Regions:
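Flavin-dependent oxidoreductase catalytic cores
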Residues: 1-490
Length: 490
């Protein structure tokens, strides 16, 4: 049977949250009250350094909006009215930093969804209009706005035909899940170099449209993240040594800087990973998902980055922190710390009270997952203090997101408190916190995971439970039917 953990909304104030943190034996600072500007550490400006040829940027405050895909672009890869609405919400947030808006594919074949945004010469002007629409909604100083660039790798689904995986190496567990069979699925070294050129072209286009930075995405099981774990790969971009497995990262960053020298470069990085998890069959009951359990795997487990080879549900920090320390010399000035993947370890990547339809019940109190993510951001900041560090996982803290975030920023754990799922249900939360306004509790994200379950069912993403706009759309009924069918199939 799945274990029920105390829900954040049931905790009577910050002291109760601290008691729960202590009971779990994790470390997570939490203030008694969320402070308004100017007293709040979250209200202080932050300067983001720049490499030679670029100018530093100053963020007005320490809130950041995380990239949140809607899977609602037009078929040609340009924004739709739904995309525009979401980005306007990011603008209304009042956050000092908008990390990419959402993932934008640098190759059409590298989309994770047929309705993912694409950047090329035909779509870039529309992305520029999206950025300007976001800025027009800002309630205060304009935020720093980046664009997240990606190739979805083994999770590529560019059309309705289904997955068309391109992989860095054959994975002992994930190949079965994604149908990545044969050597034709493996990206060749020549194709990897073409990809580096596509990232550079995308960066040049983003700079021309006024974006402050690009994110060379290395997280969540997508292609560039997978290269970091490519120990079994032959050729220039894989092997036992970290230097070989980060060669593609270095070449892409160098190409981006050469193509757009005035642009800042960031990396959203899964700083650690885990062996893939699955629902435990023995724990399922009455249509409920069983708790997550690790897939059986041979040891040593060499298919993860930041994973202990002999205990693949634990972290080995040596390579991740070595990479973080190397980033400033490459010209990277921002890092957004995350972990794992939503496809195979969602409890690690986005702690939630309610699992997505294709996931599993939490195998741990999600609060422990938040503590692990914020500790990872703390480690990254300690390893490279000159980097601007964004933390992830704070949406799960709900009413207490600012209580914890301001305590962490004050203590120097990280520079920016990232909010992702919260930016869908309640984008204005940062502005309300900094203005000292009471929070709109009916809009606070409760981690229902419908923003993930909907695209798994082929629907656009959005906060169906809490956002009246999505609650009234016909997709809500389709989502309810899909979730019911999934329960009946268990």
């Amino acid at each position: 049977m799945s274990v029920r953990f105390p829900r954040i909304a049931s905790l009577a104030g910050a002291p109760a949250l601290r008691e729960r943190i202590a009971a779990l034996g994790v470390t997570l600072p939490c203030d008694d009250d969320a402070l308004a500007a100017p007293a709040s550490p979250l209200a202080s400006p932050a300067t983001i350094a720049a490499p030679p040829g670029a100018l530093p940027r100053v963020a007005a405050n320490r809130f950041a909006v995380q990239p949140m895909e809607g899977w609602d672009a037009q078929e040609d890869g340009t924004p739709s009215a739904l995309t525009l609405r979401r980005w306007q919400g990011f603008g209304r947030s009042g956050a000092g930093l908008v990390w990419g808006g959402e993932a934008v594919a640098v190759q059409r074949a590298g989309r994770a969804n047929p309705r993912q945004l694409v950047i090329d010469e035909t779509t870039a002007p529309a992305l520029g209009r999206l950025r300007r629409a976001l800025l027009a909604e800002a309630p205060g100083p304009p935020p720093i706005v980046g664009l997240q660039l990606t190739h979805s790798g083994r999770w590529s689904r560019p059309d309705a035909a289904g997955l068309r995986p391109r992989i860095a190496f054959h994975h002992p567990v994930l190949d079965r899940r994604t149908g990545a069979v044969g050597e034709s699925a493996v990206l060749t070294d020549a194709e990897a170099r073409v990809l580096a050129g596509d990232f550079a072209r995308a960066a040049r286009l983003a700079a021309a449209e006024g974006f402050d930075f690009v994110d060379v995405k290395h997280c969540h099981g997508y292609l560039l993240h997978e290269f970091l774990a490519a120990r079994s790969r032959a050729g220039e971009f894989g092997g036992a040594g970290l230097d070989a497995r980060t060669r593609l990262l270095r070449e892409i960053v160098a190409a981006v800087r050469d193509a757009a020298p005035g642009l800042l470069v960031g990396i959203r990085l899964s700083l650690f990973d885990r062996v893939p998890f699955r629902p435990a069959p023995a724990g399922a009951s009455k249509g409920r998902l069983g708790p997550g359990e690790p897939e059986p795997c041979a040891l040593p487990y060499d298919a993860g980055f930041g994973v202990d080879r002999d205990r693949p549900t634990e972290t080995d920090w040596s390579e991740p922190l070595a990479l973080v320390r190397a980033l400033p010399a490459l010209g990277v000035t921002l890092i957004n710390v995350t972990a794992g993947s939503p496809y195979y370890v969602p409890h690690v990547q986005r702690p939630a009270a309610f699992p997505p339809s294709d996931g599993y019940a939490p195998p741990e109190d999600p609060l422990a997952g938040v503590a692990r993510l914020l500790d990872a951001a703390r480690r990254a900041k300690a390893a490279a203090p000159e980097l601007a560090v964004v933390a992830s996982g704070l949406s799960y803290l709900q009413e207490f997101a600012a209580h914890v975030a301001q305590a962490c920023v004050r203590a120097g754990w990280f520079d920016f408190a990232g909010l992702g799922r919260m930016a869908l249900s309640y984008p204005e939360l940062p502005a309300d916190v900094l203005a000292g306004r009471p929070l709109a509790r009916e809009r606070i994200c409760r981690t229902f995971s419908d923003c993930t379950s909907a695209p798994r069912a082929g629907l656009v993403s959005g906060c169906y439970p809490l956002d009246p706009f999505y609650r009234e759309r016909p997709e809500r009924e389709a989502l309810a039917r899909a979730k019911s069918a999934a329960r009946e199939a268990r």
